Amino acid sequence: MNQKILTASLAALVLTTGAFSVQAESTPPNFYSLNEVVVTASRTPKKKIDTNADVAVVTADEIAQKHYDDVSQAVRNIPGVVIANSSANGQNYNSNKLYINGSNKVVLLVDGVRMNTNGLTVGSSVTLAQHVNMNSIDHIEVLKGSASTLYGSDAQGGVINIITKKAKENQINTAVTISASSFDGEKYNLYNEGNKDGFFWAVEAQKELQGDYKDGHNNKVISHLNAESYNVKLGKDLGNDSSLVFTYNKYKSDYQRPDQAFMHTGGGSTTRDYGTKDNDAISLQYKAKITDALSNELTVYRNRTTFRDNYKSAGESWFMDMKSTGFTDQLTWKNDQHAVVGGIEYYKDEIPYFYSYASTSGAQGHHASNTAFYIQDDWKITDKWNVTPGIRFDHHSTFGNHTTPAITVGYKANENTNYYLGYKEFFVAPDLYQLFDHYSGNKDLDPQEGSTWQIGMNKQIDDSLSMSANLYRTHAKNIISYSFDTWKYENLGKTDSAGGSLSLTKQFNPNWSATFGYTYTHINSSDSQKANLNGFLPKHTLDLGITYVHDTFDASLYGRAILGREGGKGFTGRIPSEYKNYSVWNFSMNYKPVDYAKVFFKVNNIFDSYYCDVGTFTASTTDWYSMPGRNYELGVTFQF
């Protein structure tokens, strides 16, 4: 559909629905309070204020208010989280990066099912931007800090758990969303959920189009996207809190990206690189309540990605097929004093096909597997004191046996205040790309090992104000990083990192609310890199959000400021100021003229900031991937 026709049609819909305006009760935004229940930190339901961890939550209401396009946008403004894209969104190319507490070792779960494919990208084994079906999400839990005992070695930085919706009994709901946006953007989404006679389901389909964009200096940047995604969840309630759930997720896209970008020189590449993605994931999950105290959860899954980048340039193409298969079997036993979680976890990563720069040598045909046993006891010693010891045993097919203990002590000062202190060890095996890529791979890599200390608090200061604060210190040896001296992945010795974050949520009255976040990050420098991963991570990050709700209208203003991101070693004098320090502000508003329709309008990058998430990798070039300037989106959602 031509975008001008789509925009005009949407405007007509807005005017039509507005003619039947009705009033509704004023409701405050649904912040996830400290008394709500989360599951990711301990793999058992627990009030957030009682969780001995730093957990942030993004609710379905927040997603609906701010119209996040994908999961990466939803978690981008959480203190401690850094998202870095080399395009308008993370769906172009495959080197987008995710960091939590300074580490890119993050586990992604959907309803507790592992979605990682180790070696999938240069930056991370997690591709949040491809999780675009947002209507099916109930909330997103972000666990910040090492969680290796329960989730494995690649949870050094933390865990992101996407919890999907389940329709209420005897209900069927349908939503249709259509929107048009700047840069020839179009989006069409259909969502249906239901729960009848013990069967429940959720089905979502989305089509998204986007063209070339202009950055904050009005430079044209090559960027094309034609993406389709589908989610299916089918479940059966078996009675006695038991269920069987099947899920299937599909993502497919054609994209274009610039061969190079020159933010520093104010120009841009005119060479288009063409790529495709074809990813899917399938899982089966069985939950059984054996007794009042004992329950079991068994999951089997398979994740697959097919990636073709720059396929029209045979000498510079990069193709990669990856597959991860695995299962988990967990037992949970509870009484008044103990919540014991134990289980077995197995996964296998493999690269069936690999082609890079006219060669299939190296990574193709390689695979690695990991088998783990874990146990953790959340022991309530008194009404105020609790301790959570845990241990994990891993057997890696290449790197052998490793044991990682953990312990956390919690002190519940009163009903509104909880303190915790934790120590956790981790073991991170090199992924297949780091080991076997024929250009940058290094078969002599050793696993990265280390430990993290963490101290924090969760406090409900009064009925309208809550706070979470956290400090951490990590020591690691055999750091696995790309070396610009050898042009390969190397073990770069030891490093220490430290940081912390503060989150505040304030409800001023039924109409006005605000959030504030601050993050500090410091990672020691080395002989080959500057501090903070060669100047990639900012020293300071500020997050601020303000929301207004009244009757059928709501609006949100939210932004992030990046401060003290210095850039890599050897870049002195050529690093744009927009890379070191910048802020980006967004605005969204919603109006519900009738019960069955909601009109929304969104402005991204209100002040037309000129900035980039990702800088150049080497000192010999001037590649700076500038991000979109001010842009708009207008849409409507119909609910049945």
Show where each model-derived region lies.
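Extracytoplasmic beta-strand/coil segments of soluble accessory domains associated
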Residues: 47, 72, 76-114
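N-terminal periplasmic accessory domains that precede
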Residues: 71-74, 96-99, 109, 127-130, ...
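Periplasmic-side early beta-strands and strand-to-turn transitions of outer-membrane beta-barrels
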Residues: 161, 169-171, 190-277, 478
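Face-selective signature of the C-terminal outer-membrane beta-barrel domain
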Residues: 237-252, 273-414, 461, 465-472, ...
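Surface-exposed extracellular loop regions of Gram-negative outer-membrane beta-barrel proteins
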Residues: 252-254, 260-265, 350, 355, ...
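Outer-membrane beta-barrel signature, preferentially recognizing the C-terminal barrel domain
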Residues: 264-289, 416-418, 424-477, 481-507, ...
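Gram-negative outer-membrane beta-barrel transporters
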Residues: 380-386, 473-475, 491-572, 592-598, ...
